[in-house]
UniProtKB/Swiss-Prot annotation:
The modification Glutamate methyl ester (Glu) is found at residue 69. Changing residue 60 to A: Decreases DNA binding affinity and cooperative side-by-side binding between homodimers. Its EC number is 3.1.-.-. This is DNA/RNA-binding protein Alba 1. The keyword DNA-binding applies.
Amino acid sequence: MSSGTPTPSNVVLIGKKPVMNYVLAALTLLNQGVSEIVIKARGRAISKAVDTVEIVRNRFLPDKIEIKEIRVGSQVVTSQDGRQSRVSTIEIAIRKK
């Protein structure tokens, strides 16, 4: 989830946009034939990641998607003034049944 590395093609990074933008991105990947995608978020965006997965799983593709794995953790982030703080992270892997 660092900004310096390229993002794999099956990853949706959650940020400040509306949830439906990320739902559309996930659905697009699944419709292109990707069998498994990973939704990643950190900090305040974690709730959007959970919402994204639940909307895809329950509203758009019921009985066709399963949650493969959920990983939670934290990252140390250094602010502009040099202070370090921890930010929670989540990665939710979903796949077609």
